[in-house]
Structures are given as C-alpha cells and as structure tokens.
Amino acid sequence: YYFNFVQGEYFKEAEPDAKADATKKLAPRALWWFRWGAMFTFLTGLYLLWMLGKGVNQYIALGALMGIFMFLNVWLIIWPAQKIVVGITEGDAAAAAPKALRASRTNVLFSGPMLWGMFGSKHGSYDTGGFDSIAFGDIGFLIPLLLILALEVNGIVGKVGPMASVKGVIHMSVLLTAVIFGLVAFL
C-alpha cells in the first residue's frame, strides 16, 4: 500500500530534485522489503492453506487465487518494471512505469476480496470439505473466477481506468468484494 497510497502521491507533488533523490535512494530499499514481504506472505499463505486441509471452500479458493496473482504481479511485473524506473537495470522507464502501476493497482484491487475470502472461509455459508468439495463448475464459483482472471489480464495489458486514483482503487476494491462474494453466496 505504501507505493500506491504514499510514495505515488508524494512523487506527484515532489520537487524534481527530491523525487530524483527518493527514486535513487529510498525506492530501491522499499522495493526490497516489498518484494520479500510478498514472498513471505505467499509462502505463509500456502502453508496456512495446506494447514486448513478439509477447511477449504469457495471463499478461500478465490482468495488464494487472488493472493497468488498478487504475488506473481510483484515478482514478475512490478519488480522488473520498477528496476527500470529506479535505474537498477537499463530500459525504457516511461514504458515500464505504467506496467508497474497497472499491476500494483490490481494488487490493491484484489486486497479487499482476498481478505474477505480469508474471513469467508470460516464464516461463509458453505460447508468445508477441502478442495475436492469445491464446485468448480458451479456458476457461483465460475463467474467470480472468470471475473478475477479478466481483471488480472487487465492488470497485465489493460488500462487502470477508475483505479487511476487512490480513492478510485479503494472504491473498486470494495465493489469487487461485494460482487464476487455476492455471486459466491447467492448463485
């Protein structure tokens, strides 16, 4: 959230010298923690998912999928693009920055429904019976799954659209949470 809510907004207002200094000295350090924080979260998430065993249901399956996409966005899109932006590697910073922004905003978008999936896994309306019990062909699971996949594709090659602002991405995350888990619960 730091990059979306704090650093990005600061860079919009910063003097050129201050922005250049932060890009050179602060951003690489913050990106290191961001990247390895994503790795730790991913690995602990897999471990906790494995520990749930028979406690897995549609909610946590969708939340886990979004968590996996968030991890992949950090390591395969955001980090490589940001290395170019901050000058660690050669490349077109003007082309790399929008890629990082789209993936980063997609991660914020997925944060709300992913968190809801974690809560819903124990407090949702579905019985738990492990991955074998998830009705992957159920329309109430399939539509949210396809929506998540479409949003991830948009995060890779699309446009930020209403997620261009911090306020917009927060509102979109709340809306996505309501839509996904409304579909899971009522279809």
Tell where the protein language model's regions lie, with residue ranges.
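Polytopic transmembrane helical bundles with strong interfacial aromatic enrichment
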Residues: 1-187
